[in-house]
C-alpha cells in the first residue's frame, strides 16, 4: 500500500508539473545560479527552532562567533558547495518559506535530525516532505518558475544515515540489512525523481559516509578505531544508491546530453581524511572537539561537555558533525571534479 500511494503521488505530480511548465519562459543562461538544499544537519544552515542545540553555545564559535543554527563550530557543507558553484547562500525555509514574492536565491529546506522516515523523537520534516515544500513554492505559489529558475539551478540532497542508527541497534543480524537498505534508497530515489520533474540543471546526492567512524560510535574505543560492523550496511547503501542514480540518469526524459544526477562521494572523502591521506592531517581525527553532551548543561548549570583548545585541529565537531575545518577539508578533496560534474 505504501508503495502504491507513493507511485500514485509520483505520477500525479509528474503530469501536474508537465502541464504547468508550458507557461514558463525558456531557460536562461546560468549567470546567477541558485542552490536548493534538502537533508539534515550536514546541510542545515539554520532551519531548526531557536530551542535546538544548534542555536546554543559552543555551536558557531568559529563562525560567526555565536550560534547560527549550524551543527558545527562554523560553516557546513552547504556553505562550501555554494561557494564552489558561485551561488549565493540559499535562503532558509524557516525565514523565507512563507513569502509570496519571487526570490533571487535558492532555498535551504534541510533540518537537523531529518530522516527518510518520520522520527518518533525529532519533529524535523523528513526529506520527501522537504521536497514537497519546494513543489508547493514552484507549482502552487509560483515563487520559483520551473523552466526559468529551477532549470538553471542546482540541488543537493544530503543524507547522513540517521535512520540506520536505531535499526542497527535493534537488528544485529546482517540478514535484515538488505531489505531495510532497499527501503531507504527507494525513498531517496523517489525524492530524486520528484526533483527531476522540477527540471533542475543538476542534482547532487551524497553517498553514505562511514557510520562506524563517527564519534558517537568510536567513543567505545576511546576514539582510537572505527567499528567495522557498520561497514557492510554502508557498502550496501552506497551500492544501491549508485544503481538508483544510474537508473534515474538512464530514464531521464528531460536531459538529452550528460547526466543530471551526480553522487557526492562523502564516503571516499571521509576515509581519505580519517586515514590521514589528505592534504590536511588531523592528529586525532576520530575524536570530536566538543566531547560529551555538546551544548547541554546539567541542573546546576555546569557544562556536560568539554571543548578542545582549537577547533581547527579537529575533524569532528560533535558526535556526528564535522568542524568547519573538517568540511573545508572534505570539499577541498571533492573540489574541481565535483564542480565540473555539476556545472557541465
Swiss-Prot record:
Parts forming coiled coils: none
Residue numbers annotated as active site: 41, 318
GO biological-process terms attached to the record: lipid catabolic process
Entry-linked Gene3D superfamilies: SGNH hydrolase
GO molecular function, one term: hydrolase activity, acting on ester bonds
Domain of life of the organism encoding this protein: Eukaryota
UniProt family annotation: Belongs to the 'GDSL' lipolytic enzyme family.
Name under which the protein is recorded: GDSL esterase/lipase At5g03590
Species whose genome carries this gene: Arabidopsis thaliana
Lineage: Eukaryota, Viridiplantae, Streptophyta, Embryophyta, Tracheophyta
